[in-house]
Amino acid sequence: MSSLYPLTFQPIFKERVWGARNLERLYGKKLPAAVPIGESWEISDRPGDVSVIANGPLAGKDLHWLVENHRVDLLGDAKLEAGRFPLLIKLLDAQEKLSLQVHPPASKAAELRGDPKTEMWFIADAIPNAELY
C-alpha cells in the first residue's frame, strides 16, 4: 500500500514584464508585493526550481526527493527522462504579449542541452477581445 496522500506544493512565482496580479483574484495566491507575476509554477522538478511539498508528514521535502524515494508510488512504471518528474505545471497571467518562445524538437533540444517542450493550454480567464495566436 502506498504511503503517499494527496499532496499540495508551494508555488514558485516568476516575475515577468508581461505579468499581472490576477493570480491573487482567480486562485487566492499570496503573491510577492509590487511586482508583475507572470507565472506560478505549481509542480516543477527542474534544476533550481523544484517544488516543495506544503502539507502532511512530507511537508518540506521536495518533488525530486519524492521521485527518488517514492517513484513507483508516484509514477508507477513510467519512464523518466533524467530521473526527474516529467511534467511542469504552471499558471500564466499575461496582461501583455508574451516574449517570443521557441521550442525545438527533442533531437535539437538535446543537441543544445535543453529540454524538449510539448505544451497544452487551458484558458481559465480572458478579458474581452483578448487574442491568442
Give residue spans per PLM region.
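Transition-metal
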Residues: 1-133
